[in-house]
């Protein structure tokens, strides 16, 4: 019985005794300064703000995400969206509004796809966030 306890205890301690201490952070060299980092995750530094003018230059079917205001209702599910760079027509089905009301002075985020087949180009909105 004592022999089994000793064998069991040695198996429990063995991984710690044989553990390799080569892993973890190696501090052999100094990290690069923040402005010199070329790769890796940098959070919002990588984010490019999309504008209406930039969205109009994209290809048909491109995914767009814009931040601005709905400034007018053109009938049924058609609206005019404006940000700091310009205006674009958008199509927002009632289901996307989901009962929410949006005022022209409220800043909103819209996401959808660019439809350049219609003239002028429109954004078919699939998500709206107040």
Curated annotation (Swiss-Prot):
Positions of the UniProt region annotated as Disordered: 24-43
Matches recorded under InterPro entries: BOBF_sf (IPR036700), BOF (IPR005220), Ca-regulated_OB-fold (IPR052401), YgiW/YdeI (IPR016052)
Signal peptide: 1-19
Keywords per UniProt: Signal
GO biological process, one term: single-species biofilm formation on inanimate substrate
Protein name: Uncharacterized protein YdeI
Name of the gene this protein is made from: ydeI
